[in-house]
Amino acid sequence: MSSDLPPSDPVNPLRLPFDSMGPSIDFEVTLRYSDMDLFGHVNNAKYFSFLEEARIAWFEACVPEKWDFEKHGVLVVRNEMDYIQPVKPNDRLIIRVGASGMGNTSINVKYEGFVMKGGREDNTELAFRGATTLVSWDTEAGKVCRVHEPWRKTISGG
């Protein structure tokens, strides 16, 4: 019995679409020996620092103006992480980041981390999924506020 299907061709997951509501970026993490633990892989707590680096790079890439922290702040109110497989010292780590939703005062950010085992692009697999909830912060008033309008437009893709 023959099949009309083409032979299977492994797809690099970095080439698959990322379901975000607006712009997304791929951010490569520079792994350091201090990120590793005694088991020879990235320590679970380090991933949240990686998410922060990727989120800042994404924010800088997609907001239309230089971010003035003194006027428009954001606070992290929730971080989540699903670990799928370890990242080791000779691997490359790429984090895809974008918005998954937005409320009046909050921005939901999602991440997919891809490990290139041994640094090889042809050996790329999903390593983790993460999410962060941010709230917009009025630094002068010291309280939560509506997401800054220019951010709202670009982050939502509008």
Model-inferred region functions:
Residues 2-27, 83-92, 100-158:
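HotDog/MaoC-like acyl-thioester-processing domains
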Residues 46-68:
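Active-site helix/loop of acyl-thioester processing domains in fatty-acid/polyketide metabolism
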